């Protein structure tokens, strides 16, 4: 209670005693919202999808509960009642800590895209099958549109052994437990909240339980809501805008009309304070709260100005003000301060910064910078050690992490792992080792070293200190030091042609003294009776030459043989003898043959090589393989046609970086033997087996289910979910053990490795697998093995069936005795088995057990009969192929791998908390821990510095329920920063929905010279769905700014998740120039989420490099090509616009599809079948969808290049040609042809009503002077609804085409915080990807330019090989000389006599631009320079001028662009384009300058105003007519069918 009082009093003091610079006036609110393009779905469906994400069993339990409700869900009177009824059902299945998280997910509607995908599939099927009913079923390839029809179809038996492949299934499908492997598939489309659904579900549930069908449920509604989904999880900024140059339109202000949120000033929620709730909780503070509310609603006209010296300690003073208060109220105060910082800055000056605070902040700032690389003003959030960057995090992804962590917390809690032990386990980083590729120890006598960097004489002049690794060199240069730090081992079949190119290349490394130690291992796995003599001969010959001369000569001997026999011939013994006698003339033919015989003096090393290769685990016989410092290189780069040399040097540069770190840290010194240091690293394994070591497509068994106790009830067991069935199996398993199987920690006897072996002991492979496992158990430590029979053998009924006997022995004998007994049986399977007496009692039940275990193997693991599988600590290794070996050494490798990855770390935590480890903590508990901790390890976990001080600048908030599992949350932020604006509302949300311990570390910038935060901010999120008094769902959350100062000029900007593309759909006022005193009323804007991006990174599988210029298309089954793009060289990045649904990603027809094929894709909700030319991608959430695509060159295409000169196919079909996006219509292909031959493409950008007015005038001026067809391209991101609504009318009036283009600024490219600088970036950074691939040339014209010539002259100009042409700045107006920055300092020396060019007008040859990767180069240079806030002041023109020596600029004649600021009046009459440049001397407003300088400007302006008035009058008249028509008979319901894809003018 006292804290609540402190909250109110504190805020009142802050608000009431803020000094004002003028008289207060009523401040009008500014509100903003974002809607989705799809409509609202019933909340009970969103709850269902939440449960499905948790467990399939929970989903079906919920469905069962819904069907048993007394009142059908969709027959409740209100949505509130529906929601509460659904929540009551959930409470019996979901723990109390998880309920707030569920409410939050439903409030954010983050699962509605998945439900929309269900609807999409249902509508496509229903419309194609002419079903009238909205509840229907798909039975195989047929539709059942009524219940009776479904019954009849199910009565028709499915042909024996036939598979129902006609139903396409998706990862989000709900498959009834136990029916996964049934042959007949039935998909029910229906509303689980309807009465009709109950009837269908009851029938299908019965059929599924009987094993007759695979039952899938997908959502469908008979009546869909018309209200759009209101979105949250984004921020809105109002930036204080400079008024140095007037940028406001002087046109009359429009009437705002009614808004959907009337009387916003009367809302109870003001600036984050819910006064209705506060008054209910604290009635005695009612008057103070009313005063506070009124004060918050009032705003000062101006923001108090601070003197320069007052900025200095602002961050520290903000920290002092916040740290004074402890408790959750601190977060409210921090949010209020951060969100309204410009208004509160003067108030903060009253807070004293103590020496203790200053010293503590300094110490903690250094600690965070040193250990976590976090420094103010950047902010960071840590949740259970997981790092989230304040700038890039989005709430949807954060919530997914919270859900994952919640599952782990509850699993730990349910296994009685609590308190500090649970916290320590949660904080473990179990990913660090997996990021390193595993290596094999190459200190092996099988490796025949060709050279020795440390001892060979030719390297004697090289420096011998490892410190030389730190010496700076030119990029890409290798460091020559006399240490064996780069060791390349080639495993080659020296007889085969495939080895020749790599051996020749390796010889050149030695000849040219590359700092690479080279070793050879001869692969003879292809040896047989016919060619064994050849393999013996090549080994003996190599050994002979090495002894007689040296290893370098032996290597040269090999290349000499290859030169003699040719490129394609397999080398034979005869060829070897011939070459040997040629090089050793004293050697007779007979003697040479003798030396090359088996068992000769020189026949050594073959067995060693075979053993080494066996430990490598390489699969492709005859194909050369390479190891760099023991790490295998991808096999596809070690081929004759691949750029092996480039791949080697790329790997060496990676290894160099690691070695430099080791030298810097003192881990590698001159006293160390380099090869020993390298081979003693943790990632070096005794053998390599990709089945064990690979980190791709890793699968874990879900063990954390609920075990069923009554094993006799087979019917119930069959209906258990997979996870519950696994838990039941685990509860009933016994294990084999060895003498050193257990270790004691605390009071618990533990085995840290649990292995399950699935096999059929009636097969040789099955017996071998279990034999190897038990051999390892006998010698291994802290390991146990269980055997699960996977057999359908007809002899299973025999009491001497080995599967039955081994299962019985494991269940009844002590672990060590069982191991010894079973090994005797396995190693002598044909001998008559004597059954021990202890097994007699259990043998009777083993036949039933074997049948149940076979069902488990098939249903849960998908194993065929007798198929083998190994599960180690819950991770699946297999299924193993029939010829795949998995021996004792592989089990030892599995143990080593598990220890390195995680079990050693878990062991250490348990030892440190031994007092908390009691007898109840057993190996099954450990296995459940692994099952919880390992699958979630996708991100690195960090530990906070241990030496932090917490007396003055840290806010500590304990968990609200100490007895329940809690999250550990730490936030590091500067209270006077943009990071604090975003993070603080998220911290408040976390405290509302999680039981968490939160530590807030305040580390402000120690000294400021300017206002640190120049914007107001609001974050949009609600922890739970809100309802109106009548029980209906509220409209949803929106951003509200109230009490803002009325005089400052503000510009609005949205901060949305990285994968959202939003468009303004309603905004009466200019959002770029908001001045409340001029508007005199509320400002409201609405946006739509137009697209959800599919992003990705694409790489060549062979070289690992991005396939620059590769073209991708995204579409659906019915429309395969809807959007297209190209792959950047920068990180192989691409983005494509999508929306909820199932999509197909393909390579574009033409060169891309001719040269490349998709080989692999990684990412959630993606599927790629081997050999398929397309990838299925599901967009089913609001979170980012980022995929990693690998492509491979097709056979015979290894030398082909995408960007070669014959790239004339770029204008082939794609979205940009297949959709007629021009105003005049016409066929798509015809439109494309016109563009290529006649149409002039003009690009421009604008933001704000003034610049849109200027843009319209630019367009008219250009059209009036240009005779050719014109197509305008506008950046849609910042255009107002008024402009986009007017465009079709203007296009009709002036007969031009147009298209609106969008591109989301990539998350990896340095972001600009000011809107204007972002717009400048779009002018130059994305020219290669912003436009369709068939657009060959484009002219950029500034919005404030006026064209006075036929622009075709510029369009047809020869650019002389340059990718673009700009006009240089004028030099003729002499009075501006002092402002010509390019004539002094950096620019003068950089340009080296070249002129500095202006970006108001330029022409781009896009074909040339893409061919030379100009976009990639510009982005690379931008990334490097933009980190410095003082670089690229004029981004759009500084960048191309900075790159003038790398990306050539053709200089246009001066008469192409004239602006009065820089050009003399004498040149005005000959100017072809006039630009209204800002004048730094006069600061003249744009409109004033336009009317003064350009005589025709007023005429153009008046002409456009007349057109706008005419259109407005026509639309008003049409609206009145429509209203009359509607009033005639509003009882008639009209149904309009709208195509699912209907592009507007020029946009998808």
Swiss-Prot record:
Statement: the UniProt record of this protein carries the keyword Translocase: no
Pfam families per the UniProt record, alphabetical: Glyco_transf_24, Thioredoxin_12, Thioredoxin_13, Thioredoxin_14, Thioredoxin_15, UDP-g_GGTase
Reactions the enzyme catalyzes: N(4)-(alpha-D-Man-(1->2)-alpha-D-Man-(1->2)-alpha-D-Man-(1->3)-[alpha-D-Man-(1->2)-alpha-D-Man-(1->3)-[alpha-D-Man-(1->2)-alpha-D-Man-(1->6)]-alpha-D-Man-(1->6)]-beta-D-Man-(1->4)-beta-D-GlcNAc-(1->4)-beta-D-GlcNAc)-L-asparaginyl-[protein] (N-glucan mannose isomer 9A1,2,3B1,2,3) + UDP-alpha-D-glucose = N(4)-(alpha-D-Glc-(1->3)-alpha-D-Man-(1->2)-alpha-D-Man-(1->2)-alpha-D-Man-(1->3)-[alpha-D-Man-(1->2)-alpha-D-Man-(1->3)-[alpha-D-Man-(1->2)-alpha-D-Man-(1->6)]-alpha-D-Man-(1->6)]-beta-D-Man-(1->4)-beta-D-GlcNAc-(1->4)-beta-D-GlcNAc)-L-asparaginyl-[protein] + UDP + H(+)
Residues with glycosylation annotation: 181, 266, 864
Subcellular location, record wording: Endoplasmic reticulum lumen; Endoplasmic reticulum-Golgi intermediate compartment
Keywords: Endoplasmic reticulum, Glycoprotein, Glycosyltransferase, Signal, Transferase
Cofactor(s), by name: Ca(2+); Mn(2+)
Pathway in which this enzyme or protein is active: Protein modification; protein glycosylation
Domain of life where this protein originates: Eukaryota
Keyword Cell membrane found: no
Region called Glucosyltransferase, residue ranges: 1227-1548
GO annotation, cellular component aspect: cytoplasm; endomembrane system; endoplasmic reticulum; endoplasmic reticulum lumen; endoplasmic reticulum-Golgi intermediate compartment; nuclear envelope; rough endoplasmic reticulum
Chain spans, region Disordered: 243-265, 1512-1548
GO biological process, one term: protein N-linked glycosylation via asparagine
GO MF terms held by the record: UDP-glucose:glycoprotein glucosyltransferase activity; unfolded protein binding
Broad class of the protein's primary localization: endoplasmic reticulum
Annotated EC: 2.4.1.-
CDD domains: GT8_HUGT1_C_like
Motif (Prevents secretion from ER): 1545-1548
Signal sequence, renumbered to the chain: 1-22
UniProt biased composition (Basic and acidic residues): 243-253, 1512-1523
Protein task: Recognizes glycoproteins with minor folding defects. Reglucosylates single N-glycans near the misfolded part of the protein, thus providing quality control for protein folding in the endoplasmic reticulum. Reglucosylated proteins are recognized by calreticulin for recycling to the endoplasmic reticulum and refolding or degradation.
Family: Belongs to the glycosyltransferase 8 family.
Quaternary structure and interacting proteins, as annotated: Monomer. May interact with CG7484/Sep15.
Protein name stated in the entry: UDP-glucose:glycoprotein glucosyltransferase
């Amino acid at each position: 209670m006292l804290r609540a009082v402190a909250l109110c009093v504190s805020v009142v003091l802050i608000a009431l005693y803020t000094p004002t610079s003028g008289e207060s006036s009523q401040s009008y609110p500014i509100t903003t919202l974002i809607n989705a393009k799809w409509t609202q779905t019933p909340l009970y469906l969103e709850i269902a999808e939440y449960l499905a994400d948790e467990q399939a069993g929970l989903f079906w339990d919920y469905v069962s509960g819904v069907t048993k409700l007394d009142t059908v869900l969709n027959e409740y009177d209100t949505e509130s009642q529906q929601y509460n009824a659904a929540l009551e059902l959930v409470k019996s299945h979901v723990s109390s800590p998880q309920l707030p998280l569920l409410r939050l997910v439903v409030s954010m509607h983050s699962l509605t895209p998945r439900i929309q995908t269900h609807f999409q599939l249902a509508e496509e099927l229903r419309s194609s099958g002419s079903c009238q009913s909205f509840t229907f079923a798909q039975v195989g390839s047929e539709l059942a549109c009524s219940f009776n029809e479904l019954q009849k179809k199910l009565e028709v038996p499915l042909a024996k052994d036939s598979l129902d492949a006609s139903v396409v299934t998706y990862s989000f499908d709900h498959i009834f437990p136990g029916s996964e492997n049934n042959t007949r598939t039935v998909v029910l489309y229906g509303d689980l909240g309807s009465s009709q659904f109950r009837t269908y579900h009851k029938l299908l549930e019965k059929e599924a339980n009987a094993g007759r069908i695979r039952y899938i449920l997908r959502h469908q509604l008979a009546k869909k809501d018309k209200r759009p989904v209101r979105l949250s999880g984004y921020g809105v900024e109002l930036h204080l805008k400079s008024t140095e140059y007037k940028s406001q339109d002087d046109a009359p202000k429009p009437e705002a009309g009614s808004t959907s949120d009337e009387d916003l000033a009367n809302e109870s929620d003001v600036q984050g304070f819910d006064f209705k709730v506060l008054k209910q909780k604290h009635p005695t503070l009612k008057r103070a709260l009313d005063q506070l509310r009124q004060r918050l609603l009032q705003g000062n006209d101006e923001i108090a100005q601070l003197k320069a010296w007052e900025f200095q300690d602002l961050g520290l003073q903000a920290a002092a003000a916040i740290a004074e208060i402890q408790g959750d109220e601190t977060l409210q105060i921090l949010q209020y301060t951060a969100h309204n910082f410009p208004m509160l800055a003067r108030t903060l000056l009253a807070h004293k910064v103590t020496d203790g605070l200053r010293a503590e902040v300094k110490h903690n700032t250094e600690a965070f910078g040193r250990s976590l690389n976090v420094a103010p003003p950047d902010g960071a959030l840590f949740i259970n050690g997981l790092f989230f960057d304040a700038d890039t995090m989005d709430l949807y992804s954060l919530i997914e992490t919270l859900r994952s962590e919640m599952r782990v917390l509850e699993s730990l809690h349910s296994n009685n792992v609590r308190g500090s032990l649970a916290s320590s386990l949660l904080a473990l980083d179990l990913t660090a080792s997996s990021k390193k590729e595993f290596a094999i120890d190459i200190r092996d006598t099988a490796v025949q070293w060709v050279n020795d960097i440390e001892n060979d004489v030719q390297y004697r002049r090289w420096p011998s200190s490892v410190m030389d690794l730190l010496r700076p060199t030119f990029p890409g240069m290798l460091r020559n030091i006399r240490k064996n730090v780069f060791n390349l081992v080639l495993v080659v079949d020296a007889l085969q042609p495939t080895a020749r190119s790599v051996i020749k290349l390796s010889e050149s490394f030695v000849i040219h003294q590359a700092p690479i130690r080279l070793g050879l291992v001869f692969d003879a796995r292809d040896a047989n009776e016919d060619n064994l003599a050849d393999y013996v001969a090549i080994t003996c010959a190599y050994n002979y030459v090495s002894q007689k001369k040296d290893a370098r000569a032996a290597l040269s001997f090999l290349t000499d043989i290859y030169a003699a026999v040719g490129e394609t011939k397999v080398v034979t013994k005869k060829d070897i003898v011939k070459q040997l006698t040629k090089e050793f003339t004293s050697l007779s033919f007979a003697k040479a043959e003798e030396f090359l015989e088996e068992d000769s003096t020189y026949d050594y090393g073959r067995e060693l090589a075979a053993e080494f290769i066996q430990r490598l685990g390489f699969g492709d016989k005859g194909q050369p393989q390479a190891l760099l410092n023991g790490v295998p290189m991808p096999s596809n780069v070690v081929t004759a046609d691949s750029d092996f040399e480039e791949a080697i040097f790329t790997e060496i540069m990676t290894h160099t970086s690691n070695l430099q770190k080791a030298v810097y840290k003192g881990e590698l010194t001159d006293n160390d033997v380099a090869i020993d240091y390298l081979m003693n690293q943790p990632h070096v394994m005794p053998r390599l087996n990709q089945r064990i070591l690979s980190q791709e497509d890793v699968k874990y068994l879900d063990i954390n289910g609920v075990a069923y106790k009554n094993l006799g009830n087979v019917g119930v067991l069959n209906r258990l979910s997979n996870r519950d069935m696994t838990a039941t199996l685990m509860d009933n398993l016994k294990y084999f053990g060895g003498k050193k199987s257990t270790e004691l920690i605390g009071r618990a006897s533990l085995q840290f490795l649990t292995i399950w072996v699935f096999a059929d002991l009636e097969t040789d492979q099955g017996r071998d697998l279990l034999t190897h496992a038990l051999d390892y158990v006998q010698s291994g430590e802290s390991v146990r093995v269980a055997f699960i029979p996977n057999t359908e053998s007809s002899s299973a009924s025999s009491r001497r069936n080995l599967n039955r006997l081994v299962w019985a022995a494991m269940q009844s004998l002590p672990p060590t005795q069982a191991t010894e007994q079973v090994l005797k049986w396995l190693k002598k399977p044909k001998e008559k088995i004597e059954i021990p007496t202890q097994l007699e009692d259990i043998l009777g039940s083993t036949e039933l057990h074997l049948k149940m275990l076979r069902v488990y193997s098939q249903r849960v693991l998908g194993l065929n009969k007798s198929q083998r599988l190994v599960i180690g600590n819950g991770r699946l290794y297999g299924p193993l192929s029939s010829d795949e070996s998995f021996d004792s050494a592989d089990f030892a490798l599995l143990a080593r791998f598990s220890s390195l990855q995680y079990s050693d770390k878990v062991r250490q935590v348990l030892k440190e908390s031994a007092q908390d480890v009691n007898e109840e903590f057993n190996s099954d508990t450990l296995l459940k821990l692994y099952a919880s901790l390992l699958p979630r390890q996708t991100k690195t976990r960090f530990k906070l510095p241990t030496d932090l001080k917490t007396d003055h600048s840290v806010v500590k908030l304990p968990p609200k329920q100490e007895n329940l599992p809690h999250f550990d949350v730490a936030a590091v932020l500067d209270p006077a920063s943009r990071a604090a604006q975003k993070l603080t509302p998220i911290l408040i949300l976390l405290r509302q929905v999680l039981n968490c311990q939160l530590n807030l570390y305040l580390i402000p910038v120690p000294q400021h010279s300017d206002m640190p935060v120049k914007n107001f901010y609001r974050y949009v999120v609600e922890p739970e769905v809100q309802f109106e008094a009548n029980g209906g769902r509220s409209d949803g959350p929106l951003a509200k700014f109230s009490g803002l100062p009325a005089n400052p000029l503000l510009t609005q900007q949205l901060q949305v998740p990285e994968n959202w593309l939003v468009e303004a759909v309603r905004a009466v006022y200019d959002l770029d120039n908001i001045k409340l005193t001029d508007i005199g009323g509320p400002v409201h804007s609405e946006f739509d989420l137009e697209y959800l991006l599919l992003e990705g990174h694409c790489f060549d599988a062979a070289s690992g490099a991005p396939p620059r210029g590769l073209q991708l298309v995204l579409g659906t089954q019915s429309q395969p090509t809807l959007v297209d793009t190209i792959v950047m060289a920068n990180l192989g990045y691409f983005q494509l616009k999508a929306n909820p649904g199932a999509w197909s990603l393909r390579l574009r027809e033409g060169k891309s599809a001719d040269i490349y094929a998709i080989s692999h894709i990684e990412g959630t909700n993606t599927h790629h079948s081997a050999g398929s030319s397309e990838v299925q991608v599901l967009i089913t959430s609001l979170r980012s969808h980022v995929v990693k695509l690998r492509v491979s060159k097709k056979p015979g295409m290894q030398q082909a290049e995408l960007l070669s000169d014959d790239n004339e196919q770029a204008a082939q079909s794609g979205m940009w040609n297949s959709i007629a996006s021009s105003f005049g219509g016409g066929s798509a292909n015809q439109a494309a042809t016109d563009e290529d031959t006649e149409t002039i493409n003009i690009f421009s950008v604008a933001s704000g009503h003034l610049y849109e007015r200027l843009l319209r005038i630019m367009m008219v001026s250009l059209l009036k002077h240009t005779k050719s067809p014109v197509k305008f391209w506008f950046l849609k991101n910042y255009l107002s609804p008024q402009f986009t609504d007017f465009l079709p009318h203007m296009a009709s009036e002036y007969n031009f085409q147009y298209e609106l283009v969008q591109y989301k600024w990539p998350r990896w490219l340095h972001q600009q915080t000011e809107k204007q600088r972002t717009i400048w970036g779009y002018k130059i950074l994305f020219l290669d990807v912003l436009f369709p691939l068939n657009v060959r040339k484009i002219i950029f014209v500034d919005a404030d330019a006026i064209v006075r010539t036929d622009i075709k002259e510029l369009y047809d100009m020869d650019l002389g090989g340059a990718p673009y042409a700009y006009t240089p700045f004028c030099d003729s107006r002499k009075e501006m000389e002092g402002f010509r920055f390019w004539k002094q300092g950096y620019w003068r020396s950089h340009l080296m006599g070249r002129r500095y060019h202006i970006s108001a007008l330029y022409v781009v040859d896009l074909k040339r631009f893409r061919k030379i990767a100009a976009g990639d180069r510009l982005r690379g240079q931008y990334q490097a320079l933009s980190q410095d806030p003082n670089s690229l002041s004029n981004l759009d023109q500084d960048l191309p001028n900075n790159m003038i020596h790398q990306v050539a600029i053709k200089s246009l004649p001066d008469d192409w662009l004239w602006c009065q600021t820089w050009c003399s009046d004498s040149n005005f009459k000959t100017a072809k384009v006039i630009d209204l440049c800002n004048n730094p001397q006069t600061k003249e407003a744009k409109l004033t300058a336009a009317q003064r300088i350009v005589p025709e400007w007023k005429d153009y302006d008046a002409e456009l105003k007349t057109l706008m008035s005419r259109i407005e009058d026509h639309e008003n008249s049409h609206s009145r007519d429509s209203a009359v028509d509607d009033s005639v008979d509003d009882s008639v319901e009209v149904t309009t069918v709208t195509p699912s894809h209907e592009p507007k003018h020029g946009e998808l």
